[in-house]
């Protein structure tokens, strides 16, 4: 875990019995090969893969359903249950959003991780998935690179690449990415403050490093509708470019 994330999590948990810890006993793990991903009952995912593969992947994340009026974050909803789906390593987390339910399925396959989100019920017409992700290639806090590949995702859609030296991490969605936004990480004075900062946040991006040299990214994906259900799958993939090329990694991501 990066220093920024660890300090912010400590501030959030201050006042609890063990604020310095990041407990995982409440959630579940999905792993395959040399990638291991923790799935929290609040929906966020985090990589615990560095000791297995030397690749750090996702340091923090947050998922939500965005409409024209608001964003419904999964960690603000009441989780109905979390369990391993039919005795597999698929983790299903279910939430009650009032007029509809949210079903999140997480599965790790090799160095790819799939987060499948399905809504059931009276779904808002303009609803789409929003995901905040912080990648930490090489365990880096800052000075990572970020590229947007306009036609590298499924059906010629976008894919995002975050990298530092040999580790290159990718994200796309089965229904394509319609929006990719940068995020300003915690500034030095914010790291020193006592205040907990919630991400993602609305802020004016003024400097080049805010949009290109940070592992923080917000992506949006449309939902594919079938009857009273709507769904999409977010795909993240870790790669070592001493083992595979960018072209090979993007080809794996598409398929």
Residue ranges, per PLM feature:
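Terminal accessory carbohydrate-recognition/targeting modules of carbohydrate-active enzymes
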Residues: 1-255
């Amino acid at each position: 875990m990066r220093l920024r994330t660890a300090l912010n999590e400590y501030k959030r948990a201050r006042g609890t019995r063990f604020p310095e810890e990041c407990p995982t006993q409440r959630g579940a793990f999905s792993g395959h090969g040399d990638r291991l991903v923790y799935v929290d009952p609040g929906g966020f995912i985090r990589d615990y893969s560095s000791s297995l593969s030397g690749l750090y992947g996702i340091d923090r994340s947050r998922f939500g359903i965005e409409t024209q009026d608001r964003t419904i974050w999964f960690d603000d909803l009441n989780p109905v249950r979390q369990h391993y789906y039919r005795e597999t390593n698929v983790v299903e987390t279910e939430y009650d959003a009032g007029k509809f339910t949210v079903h999140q399925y997480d599965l790790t396959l090799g160095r790819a991780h799939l987060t499948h989100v399905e809504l059931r019920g009276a779904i808002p017409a303009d609803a789409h998935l929003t995901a905040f992700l912080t990648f930490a290639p090489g365990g880096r806090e800052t000075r990572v690179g970020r590229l947007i590949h306009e036609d590298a995702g499924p059906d010629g859609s976008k894919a995002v690449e975050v990298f530092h030296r040999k580790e290159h991490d990718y994200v796309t969605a089965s229904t394509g990415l319609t929006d990719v936004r940068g995020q300003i990480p915690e500034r030095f004075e914010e790291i020193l403050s006592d205040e907990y900062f919630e991400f993602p946040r609305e802020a004016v991006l003024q400097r080049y490093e805010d949009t290109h040299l940070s592992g923080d990214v917000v992506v949006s994906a449309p939902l594919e509708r079938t009857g009273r259900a709507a769904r999409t799958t977010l795909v993240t993939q870790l790669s070592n470019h001493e083992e595979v090329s960018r072209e090979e990694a993007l080809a794996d991501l598409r398929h």
